[in-house]
Amino acid sequence: MARKTKPLTDTEIKAAKPKDADYQLYDGDGLTLLIKSSGSKLWQFRYYRPLTKQRTKQSFGAYPAVSLSDARKLRAESKVLLAKDIDPQEHQKEQVRNSQEAKTNTFLLVAERWWNVKKTSVTEDYADDIWRSLERDIFPAIGDISITEIKAHTLVKAVQPVQARGALETVRRLCQRINEVMIYAQNTGLIDAVPSVNIGKAFEKPQKKNMPSIRPDQLPQLMHTMRTASISMSTRCLFMWQLLTITRPAEAAEARWDEIDFNASEWKIPAARMKMNRDHTVPLSDGALAILEMMKPLSGGREFIFPSRIKPNQPMNSQTVNAALKRAGLGGVLVSHGLRSIASTALNEEGFPPDVIEAALAHVDKNEVRRAYNRSDYLEQRRPMMQWWADLVKAADSGSIVLTHLSKIRLVG
């Protein structure tokens, strides 16, 4: 018959004195108190490892910081793990690792790592817009939460205040960006499943609205308005550059001199600055080349064609033309992105081939099969088309287009 160990008492533990050599006091079921020759008293739990069956011991801490009842609770917890073939010490190490990972893998920190990858494939302005939206609306709610603890309802709750203020388009973009962060977390091994896949379905869909724009026959009044507006020469040139090249606001504002091929009369925009992440070449009309000649002395030999007045080593803000349109009284009637719509309408009404127009707008065919077979950029066909557009703008600017039914600029779309 095996000898039964008598459980320890606090009185016995307190009375235990150090000896020349270390010795043990036994509480039973593997729990012992090691009395060191130095006088310290250390709790230990002896057990067999589930896989190797090797005898080992687990430290529970020192007495009296860890009381007798505390040590027994820790022993009970370890025995529960052992009953499931889980090594208590390995479990403890994993918890420490998870705790450390949680501190370095909060939503904010993971989002930052994702954003550093994302910004290499989008324009600087767009990358900044992504970060500002997360910084403003998401990080205050879930930025400090470990990515492993985030559930779908956590994300929905974080976005709900944005819905409450009626910013449904912002809600749509936030859901998309959050989902990209969570997919990044999955792809880097931080989480097994993506909880954000369907969070957009928890919100009302925004009504799609066209960018405020005007018809081509209203170009003369637009040109007159901008010619007489109180704006700087650089801003006026940027407005004309964006109008003549049919580019997006950020693409136009961030144009660099080293992207211009004067011999070929071309502007080669690298993929990194394009919305669709594809190189785009713009044939430059006589009017566009004239804008460049005007900007040479104004840019002062700097990298950017349209340098910022406040920070000359940086480009003008992509919203500069938008602000100028508002100051000219066109707020709500025309936005800078709408300049592309004017050109698109004019070119389509003139009968230019749709594929050539789409190429000029740097649109990507949504039909993947068709896109795979049709890789033409229609560069040569775009040259006369862009010159036709520049001639139309010039005629509108000189007032040589006969106006009809134009009492005031009106909203289109």
From Swiss-Prot:
GO molecular function, one term: DNA binding
PROSITE patterns from the UniProt entry: CB (PS51900), TYR_RECOMBINASE (PS51898)
Database matches in NCBIfam families: PRK09692.1
Protein name: Prophage integrase IntA
Upper lineage: Bacteria, Pseudomonadati, Pseudomonadota, Gammaproteobacteria, Enterobacterales
Pfam families attached to this UniProt entry: Arm-DNA-bind_3, Phage_int_M, Phage_integrase
Keyword NADP found: no
Keyword DNA-binding among record annotations: yes
Annotated keywords: DNA integration, DNA recombination, DNA-binding, Viral genome integration, Virus entry into host cell
Catalytic site: 248, 275, 337, 340, 363, 373
Upregulation: By AlpA.
